[in-house]
């Protein structure tokens, strides 16, 4: 196990997984990461319920099983029409309680949520780790907080 995964596995570390591209692989289309153009996303979500058909990531499932759910959460930017599908996907496939799925409206709100989790769990920001697929988001979190930042690729060899 890598040093970073060992750190995430420590009981006091709060691990926060992004949903799209981390817990939910981009496999929306037939042999494609996308099933529609961005402008058609709302209609697609409302009519096709894509989160009901996405496969979970086995390496992350095993990690959460071993760590337990107490200090594991999911946090994702979501529009109101995406919330139910995202929450249901995480609860059904990763066993997290529904109140451990934090859905926010913007990347800035995600930063605020990470800070709030440090307070909620009475830990330093360093003990709150965001697992994310977007390097730009990881860079922003690293710049604005003291949180640990982890690219999802760290789980490829778990």
Regions found by a protein language model. Name each.
Residues 2-89:
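Alpha-helical substrate-recognition element adjacent to the catalytic core
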Residues 70-71, 127, 148:
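Residues at the starts of beta-strands that form the adenosine-phosphate
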Residues 73-76, 130, 151:
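Structural beta-sheet core signal
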Residues 85-95, 116-120, 140-146:
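Short, aromatic/basic amphipathic alpha-helical patches
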Residues 99-101, 147-156:
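Short hydrophobic/aromatic-enriched beta-strand-loop microsegments
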Residues 134-140, 151-158:
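Short glycine/proline-centered loop/turn elements that form peptide/ligand docking sites
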């Amino acid at each position: 196990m890598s040093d970073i995964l060992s750190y995430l596995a420590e009981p006091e570390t709060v691990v926060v997984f992004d949903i799209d591209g981390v817990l939910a692989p981009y496999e929306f289309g037939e042999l494609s990461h996308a099933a529609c153009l961005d402008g058609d996303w709302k209609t697609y979500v409302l009519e096709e319920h894509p989160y009901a058909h996405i496969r979970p990531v086995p390496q992350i499932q095993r990690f959460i099983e071993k760590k337990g759910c107490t200090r594991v959460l999911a946090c994702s930017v979501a529009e109101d029409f995406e919330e139910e599908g995202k929450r249901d996907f995480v609860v059904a496939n990763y066993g997290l309680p529904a109140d451990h799925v934090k859905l926010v409206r913007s990347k800035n709100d995600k930063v605020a949520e990470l800070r709030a989790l440090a307070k909620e769990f009475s830990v330093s920001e360093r003990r709150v780790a965001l697992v994310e697929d977007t390097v730009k988001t990881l860079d922003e979190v690293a710049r604005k907080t003291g949180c640990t930042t982890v690219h999802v690729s760290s789980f490829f060899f778990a």
